Amino acid sequence: MGKPGRSSIPSVGVHHQGPMSFPDFSASDAQIQWQRFCDLLWYHEDLGIWLDISRMHVNPSHLEQLQPGFDKAFAAMAELEAGAIANPDEQRQVGHYWLRTPQLAPNEAVRDQIATEIDQIDQFGRDVISGVIKAPGGQPFTDVLWIGIGGSGLGPLLMIRALQGHGSGLPFHFFDNVDPNGMSAVLAELDDRLATTLVVTVSKSGGTPEPHLGMEQARHRVESRGGRWADQAVAITMVDSKLDREAQQDGWLKSFSMFDWVGGRTSITSAVGLLPGALIGADIRDFLAGAAQMDDATRLADLRRNPAALMAASWFVAGDGKGRRDMVVLPYRDRLEVFSRYLQQLVMESLGKRLDRDGNEVNQGIAVYGNKGSTDQHAYVQQLRDGVDNFFATFIEVLEDVSDIPVIKDECPGDFLDGFLQGTRSALTEGGRQSLSISMRRFDARRLGALIALFERAVGFYGDLVNINAYHQPGVEAGKKAAAAILDLQSRVEAVLKDGAPRTVSEIRQAVGDGSDEAIFWIMRHLAGNDRGYRAEGDWANPASIRFSCS
């Protein structure tokens, strides 16, 4: 089995007489299961990663039917990597693959910018950890407060949970929501160490409300304690965005670039994921190298020998091409506990679309959930085995255990973990449930990069198979607009109530001139529930009776 690359193809199994020759699925015949396992197994020798789709109900006839669709998907992916407008709704290129192989970028300026950014991030991380770059008071930085939403929060959280070793780099704290209680808890935990905390704000446009609100709360707390905000603030944003201009004008400690052609859910190999990796002492170049290796393996225009294509085909067949089965992610390692949440965004934001590229209403998508094994075996696996058959499982295992957890009385925790995975996989198969498995010899930055790249490419292929734009998010934008409308309505409601006169929600709506009674009730219930200067009189069980006023 040779090392994979452009001239050496990853091993994909043996015993097949033709390109689509393997036995049809059988839940009861162990020899057929073994034959399918041998025939369908994909293996990357250098990465030490296996993909097994043999327990998915994929038969040769399915792959033959999907071949024309994959021919188009392979061509579309090649065009995307070459710089085509792959996101036509927003007239944008899609370039996250360039981030780990800069020579693919369409021009020298972009290639140089990517390479320079990686060098700067790597050096900045080293300088912060070593104390060369110091906090405003002259002490070394002790912590990082990371402010980001969506992929700008999930990607960094995955990097930290998956790669940070004990005592390695700086401890991380997150503002990844606008929950006041959550912010308060983080700030209370930092307490006096806030003065030696590096505060990183991530916002591509610089105008997203959630990171802006988190940033202002952090700035207020720093400055209220006499700190110098600019000397401990870092921005990750697009050049000349609102946030970038503020950082440049106020002299922030550092700014790193986000690119118009990288979406949040695929930004983990940009500064969004590389900076947290650098700040915990992870090998970010190895992380990028792993992603690049998997990218190379998944460029192969051969359905049977491309792991991302095999995954996408399995998803398609399992859900009849309409997302009729959920994806349950079961990583049997604590370090990958966040991975199911990461995949939730990557898969659901990419594939959950109302319209296809031709404007037809299709309501596509694959729901994703999961936590970790073997914890999940004592939670929802009961339903997976005996309940509604509306899912397929994705098992993820790491073979190599740590050396400091010994075998005691002939019992090894790693053996039990492996046994639990195999047992659950077998029990699901016996119950007619589908699953695929990803196995890794070891887990480190390189394998994490490869794992992420595998799913990124599979999502792209699946999007092409079902003819949807996997690179925009109109539903998210619709939610942002609706939220902005509610906040605008709230400001007008508060203006009406300034005269102090008690009003029902219906009377408030009439005075405002638009909005709905229900929306106004929700607004007023929130305001009255906090110390914001509003009173509510009436029966809460009868919302129409309550009269709200400004005290």
Curated annotation (Swiss-Prot):
Any one GO BP annotation for this protein: glucose 6-phosphate metabolic process
Pfam families noted in UniProt: PGI
Entry's localization field: Cytoplasm
InterPro entries in the cross-refs: G6P_Isomerase (IPR001672), Phosphoglucose_isomerase_CS (IPR018189), SIS_dom_sf (IPR046348), SIS_PGI_1 (IPR035476), SIS_PGI_2 (IPR035482)
Reactions catalysed, as given in the entry: alpha-D-glucose 6-phosphate = beta-D-fructose 6-phosphate
Coiled coil: none
Enzyme Commission code: 5.3.1.9
Single annotated GO MF: glucose-6-phosphate isomerase activity
Recorded metabolic or biological pathway in which this protein acts: Carbohydrate biosynthesis; gluconeogenesis; Carbohydrate degradation; glycolysis; D-glyceraldehyde 3-phosphate and glycerone phosphate from D-glucose: step 2/4
Residues of the active site: E349 (proton donor), H378, K480
Main location (coarse class): cytoplasm
Broadest EC class assigned to this enzyme: isomerase
Keywords: Cytoplasm, Gluconeogenesis, Glycolysis, Isomerase
Recorded GO CC terms: cytosol
Family: Belongs to the GPI family.
PANTHER family linked: GLUCOSE-6-PHOSPHATE ISOMERASE (PTHR11469:SF1)
Function recorded in the entry: Catalyzes the reversible isomerization of glucose-6-phosphate to fructose-6-phosphate.
Name used for this protein in its record: Glucose-6-phosphate isomerase
Organism expressing this protein natively: Parasynechococcus marenigrum (strain WH8102)
Upper classification of the organism: Bacteria, Bacillati, Cyanobacteriota, Cyanophyceae, Synechococcales
